[in-house]
């Protein structure tokens, strides 16, 4: 819930104070042209930009933790490997030296304590065949699946995806659309899509 929200930083304010509610069970799309304030709205909701005026409250129940950090995961999809690993860029996937130093998908995912969740996500996103692949050798579609799996393994209440369809060919977009549809049925997870027009 955000009521009368105005961020402190005067350089990144929206034209009007923000008041809106995301109700339990809702999945939301924030749609608009570039520069319309979509990312700023997300930054307000995640607490990246503290409010000067208004209030921002969360109800993450039934989560055991109450922090936005633990309960909100944000993935910005771009044609780079920035969200997967800040040290790798898309063009580096062709550099043989970088391939030697690049971690495997299994290494970046790390140890997963909840085996049932791991099995569910690995099946949903077909992760098993990727586990021994170097992260910089993943296709755009595989990278999306990896990023979603990595985020969902933390069991967030809210998953925000900024332009998840960017850079994907038509068959991969259709696959991602179907995966997102399946994600909407995962228990307490709320999905927020940020889409540029």
Which residues fall in each region the model found?
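Helix N-cap at the start of a conserved alpha-helix in ABC-type nucleotide-binding domains
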Residues: 170-172
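Conserved ABC ATPase signature
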Residues: 134-138
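Catalytic Walker B motif of ABC-type/P-loop ATPase nucleotide-binding domains
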Residues: 159-163
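Conserved ABC ATPase "signature" region
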Residues: 113-130
């Amino acid at each position: 819930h955000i009521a009368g929200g105005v961020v402190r930083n005067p350089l990144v304010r929206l034209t009007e104070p923000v008041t809106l509610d995301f109700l339990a069970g809702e999945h939301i799309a924030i749609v608009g042209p570039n520069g319309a304030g979509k990312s700023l709205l997300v930054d307000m909701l995640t607490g990246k930009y503290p409010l000067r005026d208004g209030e921002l409250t969360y109800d993450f129940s039934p989560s055991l933790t109450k922090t936005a950090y633990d309960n909100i995961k944000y993935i910005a999809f771009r044609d780079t490997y920035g969200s997967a690993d800040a040290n790798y860029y898309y063009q580096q996937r062709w550099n043989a030296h970088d391939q030697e130093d690049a971690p495997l998908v299994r290494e970046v995912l790390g140890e997963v304590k909840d085996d049932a969740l791991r099995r569910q996500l690995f099946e949903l996103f077909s992760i098993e065949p990727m586990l021994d692949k170097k992260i910089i050798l993943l296709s755009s579609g595989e990278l999306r699946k990896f990023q979603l799996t990595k985020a969902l393994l933390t069991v967030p209440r809210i998953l925000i995806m900024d332009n998840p369809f960017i850079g994907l060919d038509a068959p991969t977009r259709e696959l991602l659309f179907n995966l997102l549809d399946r994600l909407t049925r995962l228990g307490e997870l709320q999905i927020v899509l940020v889409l540029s027009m």
